[in-house]
Amino acid sequence: MAASSLSSATSYLHSFRRRNSCVSLQGVSDMECNIARTNVSVWRSSANYVRMDCGVKKFSGKAVVVKQLQNRAGTFRCATMEEVEAEKSLIETNTKQRMEKTIETIRSNFNSVRTNRASPTMLDRIEVEYYGTPVSLKSIAQISTPDASSLLISPYDKSSLKAIEKAIVTSQLGVSPNNDGEVIRLSLPPLTSDRRKELAKVVSKLAEEGKVAVRNIRRDALKSYEKLEKEKKLSEDNVKDLSADLQKLTDEYMKKVESIYKQKEQELMKV
């Protein structure tokens, strides 16, 4: 090994400390005199691994001897920059995906709240007890809109008609189903002022739940960054910078939630 490697080895050995151990460098003559009565270990490094092994090795033709009170060996691994960057990237990607999924959920929940115009998405949240198992209505029936104020439900299995009817009655849709034994028709009455206000409260609650979900995602990401800091993979300044970027992302998605909410509120209040 080159002289620079010996210097590096010496530096690592001087900085290495272990419980019940006393580490020091000895020259060749010390090794020759004390080899019979001294536990010895050597240092070697490969990539980002540091290992202390029992025995004697030579660097540039000269042995490096390490005294220890106990004959112990262990491997210590330090994360590479590439690995740290990969962990950061994974946290960022996961955070953005979860926030995007939250937006999709909010849209779906808003679509299930009826407005003046009939839409199959109004039935997205309705679950039917089908052979003892709750399933989504759209998975067991075809839903269409014959006109702007009605919905037509055609079940794939006619025996599920009663279960579908019951699910609609117990939902918060606010309509009465008409079951003719073949299909179910839903006629949507015009929204009254009071009903609009009630639905506006429902939408407001759904929006707030979405905002809470986004904040919780931010909290989880921040905890992940702090964990990397405790593991000495990130510095305090790194975490501050990442937290600032995370807050910008959070603000962006909070604005998306607010925008979707305002749009739905306008639809509800439109006569």
UniProtKB/Swiss-Prot annotation:
Signal peptide range = none
According to UniProt, the tissues expressing it are described as: Restricted to photosynthetic tissues.
Gene Ontology cellular component terms for the protein in this record: chloroplast; chloroplast stroma
Alphabetical list of InterPro entries matching this protein:
Ribosome_recyc_fac, Ribosome_recyc_fac_dom, RRF_sf
Task: Tell me the Gene3D superfamilies matching this sequence.
Answer: 3.30.1360.40, Ribosome-recycling factor (1.10.132.20)
Could you list this entry's UniProt keywords, alphabetically sorted.
Chloroplast, Coiled coil, Plastid, Protein biosynthesis, Transit peptide
What Pfam families does the record point to? RRF
Q: Which GO terms describe its biological process?
A: plastid translation
- Keyword Protein biosynthesis in annotation: yes
Superkingdom of the organism of origin: Eukaryota
Q: Which region of this protein is its transit peptide?
A: 1-78
Q: Name one GO molecular function term.
A: ribosomal large subunit binding
User: What is its subcellular localisation?
Assistant: Plastid, Chloroplast stroma
Coiled-coil residues are 213-260
Q: How does it assemble?
A: Modeling onto the 70S ribosome suggests it binds to PSRP1.
Further information: Expression seems to be light-independent.
Give the family this protein belongs to, as stated in its UniProt record.
Belongs to the RRF family.
Describe the task this protein carries out: Responsible for the release of ribosomes from messenger RNA at the termination of chloroplastic protein biosynthesis.
- What is this protein's name? Ribosome-recycling factor, chloroplastic
